[in-house]
Amino acid sequence: LAPLGEDYLKIMKEGFDNRWIDYAETIGKRTGAFCSSPYGANSFILMFFTEDMNDCMTLAHELGHAGHFQLAYKNQNILDGRPSMYFVEAPSTTNELLVEFYLKNKAGDDLRMKRWISSQMVAKTYYHNFVTHY
């Protein structure tokens, strides 16, 4: 996520350091992943994290929401901080794509990894944003 700059990376680090992410699998916890960002407070990410690559991509996605809302609330008043539905997925998708491109570059000659990343780009990034939301 380095291309997004030091300020953005500080927000990501703050999320990890200050435990914004509830990743434990507990009884009664909702499945899937969700980021809640109340105005004037830190974001909260709810998800199950089993340390597989799918969960890493989901975490990158939810951190995109968290980073977006932290920056929006820092620079907008309470009435202007929430984006439209058409824009809300852009920062999280950007995070996903940056991680996917980073992994693809690191994969070298590992064709299996490159195929997996390409499938993620279609199955999760594209499908989630353009089929489930619109």
What are these regions (language model features)?
Residues 1-134:
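Cation-handling catalytic/transport regions enriched in His/Asp/Glu
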